[in-house]
């Protein structure tokens, strides 16, 4: 089974191309114009073992919203295409990741339905060059396209550490949920 995708999206605000290999080695080439977001996507790729190429150009002279939102939408679409009919996947997984004084927990269900519940304890308006509030919106955008459920929570005193712990917990839970365990659709309905 070839679990790869190559997707693109062009709007008046952004121009994005994404390549994804779910059965990769955690190799990445990320360029979004938002340095802290690049760092988060690199951590996601490395810890999920998903090979990821993201080339995004957006209207970051306005702010980071359109670029990060559209990367989330397209990343979700790339995931949905790569995962296919979900035959044999573990489907549900969770991970807890500490980073210094911070800790994050993320649980995922690749259910075919979209739901996002993320609670972060950010105290600053920005984390590096990325607005703090866009972190939740990135996950909402990803989930709406990927068609999965995600619950995440973080606590800590350092926003950088919290965000990084969240992206790593997301990566580790997704890595586990996409593992092939058998040859069946993991649902009593027979479809996801």
UniProtKB/Swiss-Prot annotation:
An annotated Gene Ontology molecular function: imidazoleglycerol-phosphate dehydratase activity
Descriptive protein name: Imidazoleglycerol-phosphate dehydratase
EC numbers for this chain: 4.2.1.19
Domain of life from the UniProt record: Archaea
GO CC annotations, alphabetized: cytoplasm
Cellular compartment(s): Cytoplasm
Residue spans crossing the bilayer: none
Pathway connected to this protein: Amino-acid biosynthesis; L-histidine biosynthesis; L-histidine from 5-phospho-alpha-D-ribose 1-diphosphate: step 6/9
Gene encoding the protein: hisB
Catalyzed reaction equations: D-erythro-1-(imidazol-4-yl)glycerol 3-phosphate = 3-(imidazol-4-yl)-2-oxopropyl phosphate + H2O
GO biological process, one term: L-histidine biosynthetic process
Family (UniProt): Belongs to the imidazoleglycerol-phosphate dehydratase family.
Classification via NCBIfam families: PRK00951.2-1 (NF002111), PRK00951.2-4 (NF002114)
Keywords: Amino-acid biosynthesis, Cytoplasm, Histidine biosynthesis, Lyase
Location (main, coarse): cytoplasm
């Amino acid at each position: 089974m070839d679990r790869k995708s190559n997707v693109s999206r062009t709007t008046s605000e952004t121009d994005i191309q994404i390549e994804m290999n779910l059965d990769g080695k955690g190799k990445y080439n990320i360029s979004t114009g938002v340095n802290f977001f690049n760092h988060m996507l690199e951590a996601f790729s490395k810890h999920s073992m998903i090979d990821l190429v993201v080339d995004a150009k957006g209207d970051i002279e306005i702010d980071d919203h359109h670029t990060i939102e559209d990367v989330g939408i397209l990343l979700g679409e790339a995931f949905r295409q790569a995962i296919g009919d979900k035959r044999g996947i573990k489907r549900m997984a969770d991970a807890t990741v500490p980073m210094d004084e911070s800790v994050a927990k993320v649980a995922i269900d690749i259910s075919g339905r979209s739901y996002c519940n993320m609670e972060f304890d950010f105290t600053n308006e920005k984390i590096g060059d990325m607005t703090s509030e866009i972190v939740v919106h990135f996950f909402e955008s990803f989930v709406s396209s990927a068609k999965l459920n995600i619950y995440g929570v973080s606590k800590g005193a350092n926003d950088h550490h919290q965000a990084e712990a969240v992206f790593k917990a997301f990566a580790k839970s997704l890595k586990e949920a996409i593992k092939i365990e058998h040859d069946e659709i993991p649902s009593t309905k027979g479809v996801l």
